[in-house]
Amino acid sequence: MSIEKVRAAFAALEIADRIRELDESSATVALAAQALGCEPRRIAKTLSFQGKEQPILIVAAGDGKIDNHRFKERFGVKAKMLAAEEVPEKIGHAVGGVCPFAVNEGVEVYLDDSLRRFETVFPACGSSNSAIDTISKFTCAICSRLFRACVRSFHLA
C-alpha cells in the first residue's frame, strides 16, 4: 500500500505520527478541504505530468492553475497529464493519493511558488483518505532529503 511507503519514510524522520488518516475521502481538493476543515487553497495538490523522459510531479496550492505556455517553456514539452491508469505504475501512488513523498525512482518533483503563501499546507500521504499538515518549507526539505527528488520552486500561473 502506498500510504505504508510514506509512513515508513516518515518514520525515519520521526514524523509518521503526523499522518492523518481520515474517515472520509480526501481524493480531490474540495473533498480534502472539507475533510480537514480548511480552505481549499491550503490543500497541496500534486499533479502528474509526462516530461520528455521521466514523469513530473508539480505540487501547488489548491487554487493554483497550470499555465501551459510557462510549462512548455520550463520543461520543453506540452503539459500533458498522465492518464489515471498510468499514475500508479509511473509515480507509485494511485490518483487521489498522489503526493510528493515516497515516489518512484526518477520522478521529478517541483514545488510551485503558490505554496509559499501559507505557513502550513496539507499534501496527501499516498492514499485517498490521508494528509499531513506540514510547513511548506518542510515539505521541500523532506522531498529532497528522503526521496532524492529534484525539488525546484517556480511559479506556473
Regions found by a protein language model. Give the residues of each.
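Extended, low-hydrophobicity, polar/charged segments
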Residues: 1-157
